[in-house]
UniProtKB/Swiss-Prot annotation:
It catalyses: GTP + H2O = GDP + phosphate + H(+). Required for accurate and efficient protein synthesis under certain stress conditions. May act as a fidelity factor of the translation reaction, by catalyzing a one-codon backward translocation of tRNAs on improperly translocated ribosomes. Back-translocation proceeds from a post-translocation (POST) complex to a pre-translocation (PRE) complex, thus giving elongation factor G a second chance to translocate the tRNAs correctly. Binds to ribosomes in a GTP-dependent manner. It is an enzyme of class 3 (hydrolase). Keywords: Cell inner membrane, Cell membrane, GTP-binding, Hydrolase, Membrane, Nucleotide-binding, Protein biosynthesis. CDD domains: EF4_II (cd03699), EF4_III (cd16260), LepA (cd01890), lepA_C (cd03709). HAMAP family: GUFP (MF_03138), LepA (MF_00071). This is Elongation factor 4. GO terms for biological process: positive regulation of translation; translation. Coiled coil: none annotated. Belongs to the TRAFAC class translation factor GTPase superfamily. Classic translation factor GTPase family. LepA subfamily. Its EC number is 3.6.5.n1. The gene is lepA.
Amino acid sequence: MTDVSVSKIRNFCIIAHIDHGKSTLADRLLQETGTVQAREMKEQFLDNMELERERGITIKLQAARMNYRAQDGEQYVLNLIDTPGHVDFSYEVSRSLQACEGALLVVDASQGVEAQTLANVYLALENDLEIIPVLNKIDLPGADPERVKREIEEVIGLDCSGAIEASAKSGIGIGEILESIVHLVPPPSDTTGEPLRALIFDSYYDPYRGVIVYFRVIDGTVRKGDRIRLMASGKEYEIDELGVLSPNQVQVEELHAGEVGYIAASIKAVADARVGDTITLARARATEPLPGYVEAKPMVFCGLFPTDSDRYPDLRDALEKLQLSDAALQYEPETSSAMGFGFRCGFLGLLHMEIVQERLEREYNLDLITTAPSVVYQVTTLDGEVLRVDNPSKLPPPQQREKIEEPYVKVEIITPENYVGALMDLCQTRRGIFIDMKYLTQERTTLIYEMPLAEVVTDFFDQMKSRTKGYASMEYSLIGYREGELVRMDILINSEPVDPLATIVHRDKAYYVGKALVEKLKELIPRHQFKIPLQAAIGSRVIASESIPALRKDVLAKCYGGDISRKKKLLQKQAKGKKRMKAIGTVDVPQEAFMAVLKLDREG
């Protein structure tokens, strides 16, 4: 690893919607530059997590350094910083964009611009990145590059006359992409003489070396053995190992302004090296940290409980370890009369929640019961105190509260024109407020709605996909809190309230949701030896009820003809036994019942 002049460094990332071929393109660039030998190559090289390969999405950020000899004969260093494309991980995208000077905008030549591409492009424009449009999958029969170029020009306002037509899968246009990175992406500014400032854009936990921090040097120089200080947390560490990612770790002695690398410094937890934090030297420290760091806040909460309560310590250890590599995950212990001991966890969104659950089950062999997700409500009490409530069972009673506010999001849906009616109908039933509708092209439309986050986190995404045969894509961003007519609905099974099934609903929809929920529970809870009443209640008022009939033995089977009083005696004896059993019996509630809230038909 020789010293490189700053003018020969290019830092870039790839922006794309899910499935537009970003990871495949990254693979081709690694191969073309000889960074990864053909025999070591596996698909989605930068997606290290097994789960990422399986779902075909990028979750954690990766980075790779490539040496490339351009056609002008000069040797360049290209740093690719891979970004996730999913809406939940937009905070990961924003910090990786901060580490770049340029971005490849990858758009599927048959699909066109999608919602998440747009959101990420706007982030890139905010960071003043040079954007190079690339039309991928050009060899597909449905590809229409001219239409997609027009779309990019109209929607984003980028000049597409020089857009590169490529196919990452068959390797078309890869050389052209590399050349345009060298010629169009500006080099980093040369600030080697300034005090050290480096931006952390990712970190992960290594069980042997502690936290490995991926960073980009913005100003100054960092050397192995330096004592560094993290400006947000104020903690100091000594660098044990310094290196670059090509894409495997290669140790170096020092890194200068503009370079991308990693540090191991015996850091105990990822929370100590927060992403977006600034690294500086302990002695000659910088006065100002780098701007734009925001701590990621969980938007969605749910309860996680082990099916076997003896494994509670294992779940705690697993969450601790996961939090080491996922700073956005929050958790705190929670107990529930129905489920025993568990944790209340906070996530960035639904996909993040699913991934954490799946990783807990897969990597730590845990069997989990999860409660339905809820969002954070703001409750103002009569004393004027503002409480943040992330668990419906913690909502103060009506006589103690002045108002409840819920988070609202701005939802942008890009859809083919013929599904607009179905989507407007869906948004209307989810308490959406229509804001705007724009035609991107003759066939594609953007719908903009404002709606409560609680309506989006349940199954809005699935409903949207099924109503548009999978063609629509969406993006949402938080716009603040608004007051609403919200009530807590409790579910009583056998006259006992079950905390994990409690939900906060809008008063107008309470009856429909309650009715649908008890009907769903009736299907899911198996019959017992005694009759089980199911009720949905707001306060002490029952708004919907169902009952699961008892399984009963035919006690009259032995009576042939004979006296009616004999039959009555046997039936009364059975009824007495059932009554006693009901008083002391417990109801087994299966896992599916707790997720029933998600799969309700909410269209009342």
